[in-house]
């Protein structure tokens, strides 16, 4: 039977990696870690106008139900252990979106003694969303970039 015959009969061929990654991109459940004004834009992205639900993004209240963490705002030294603890409670595979200049590199408060100069010093970050504060459209674009990154990742060989 040739490939034309298989496709004519209604069969679809793919790899396990592509199938698993396709399902993961359609069901991202973020844990919101809103620390400052960027959290307002994150809530705006989840509201009716931008509706992240249409991308399969459903905000979850517990880290044990989440696979994405959105760090939105200024991360202080006092909150860094809590951020790491919440990240460690999330199930594998897990991804992190750093939202806003403060979460990316300290932002306006970069030279303050109490600010962590980027949440990537505490947890590994997959997508950076720039801006002060970034718009809801920027967060939606960041989610789309994360979905593209998940599609490119080898699921079975991932450690």
From Swiss-Prot:
Keyword Iron recorded: yes
Cofactor binding note from Swiss-Prot or TrEMBL: Binds 1 [4Fe-4S] cluster.
GO biological process, one term: aerobic respiration
Keywords attached to this entry: 4Fe-4S, Cell inner membrane, Cell membrane, Iron, Iron-sulfur, Membrane, Metal-binding, NAD, Quinone, Translocase, Transport, Ubiquinone
EC number in record: 7.1.1.-
Gene3D superfamilies associated with the record: 3.40.50.12280
List of residues binding [4Fe-4S] cluster: 37-38, 102, 132
Catalytic activities: a quinone + NADH + 5 H(+)(in) = a quinol + NAD(+) + 4 H(+)(out)
A GO term for molecular function: quinone binding
Cofactor section: [4Fe-4S] cluster
UniProt keyword annotation of NAD present: yes
Topology of the protein relative to the lipid bilayer: Peripheral membrane protein
Principal location listed in the UniProt entry: membrane
Enzyme class: translocase
Subcellular location: Cell inner membrane
GO cellular component assignments: plasma membrane; respiratory chain complex I
The protein's assembly and partners: NDH-1 is composed of 14 different subunits. Subunits NuoB, C, D, E, F, and G constitute the peripheral sector of the complex.
Database matches in HAMAP family: NDH1_NuoB (MF_01356)
Family: Belongs to the complex I 20 kDa subunit family.
Task performed by this protein: NDH-1 shuttles electrons from NADH, via FMN and iron-sulfur (Fe-S) centers, to quinones in the respiratory chain. Couples the redox reaction to proton translocation (for every two electrons transferred, four hydrogen ions are translocated across the cytoplasmic membrane), and thus conserves the redox energy in a proton gradient.
UniProt protein name: NADH-quinone oxidoreductase subunit B 1
Gene assigned in the entry: nuoB1
């Amino acid at each position: 039977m040739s490939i034309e015959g298989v496709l004519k009969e209604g069969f679809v061929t793919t790899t396990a990696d592509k199938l698993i990654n396709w399902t993961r991109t359609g069901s991202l459940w973020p844990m919101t870690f809103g620390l400052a004004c960027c959290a307002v834009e994150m809530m705006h992205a989840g509201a009716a106008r931008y509706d992240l639900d249409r991308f399969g993004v459903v905000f979850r209240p517990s880290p044990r139900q989440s696979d994405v963490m959105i760090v939105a705002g200024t991360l202080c030294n006092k909150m860094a252990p809590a951020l790491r603890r919440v990240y460690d409670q999330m199930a594998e595979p897990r991804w992190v979106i750093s939202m806003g200049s403060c979460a990316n590199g300290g932002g306006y408060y970069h030279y303050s003694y109490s600010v962590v100069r980027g949440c990537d010093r505490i947890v590994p970050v997959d997508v950076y969303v720039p801006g002060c504060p970034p718009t809801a459209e920027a967060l939606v674009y960041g989610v789309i970039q994360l979905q593209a990154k998940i599609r490119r990742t080898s699921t079975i060989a991932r450690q």
